[in-house]
């Protein structure tokens, strides 16, 4: 399943986040796959698409960052799947 993970960087934490990433990498467990991400120009948020079959894997991954990042996790589907799902209701 796909998830939009919105990372809310804690105040002043952006340098710490990037330093930790350089030293330790993403720290996602096997089965939690990173697809892509975008960071706001003010370094306050990151919008990240992750793919995994077990939501608990995301919790495990987020626990590695929860001291400097607050997370919002939203299950998502592709536009193609959304179009197919809504078609019978049109």
Regions from the PLM with identified roles:
Residues 49:
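Small, basic N-terminal interaction modules of short regulatory proteins
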Residues 62:
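Short, flexible helix/strand-to-coil boundary loops that buttress conserved ligand/catalytic motifs
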Residues 1-35, 39-45, 53-57, 77-90:
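Short S/T/G/P-rich N-terminal loop/turn motif that feeds into the first structured element of a domain
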Residues 68-79:
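Conserved short beta-strand edge segments in small beta-sheet-based binding/regulatory domains
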């Amino acid at each position: 399943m796909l998830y939009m993970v919105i990372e809310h960087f804690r105040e002043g934490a952006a340098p710490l986040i990037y330093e930790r990433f350089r030293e330790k990498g993403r720290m996602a467990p096997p089965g939690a796959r990173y697809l892509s991400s975008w960071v706001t120009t003010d370094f306050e948020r990151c919008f990240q698409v992750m793919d995994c079959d077990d939501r608990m894997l995301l919790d495990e991954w987020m626990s590695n960052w929860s001291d400097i990042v607050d997370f919002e996790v939203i299950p998502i589907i592709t536009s193609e799947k959304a179009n197919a799902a809504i078609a019978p209701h049109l």
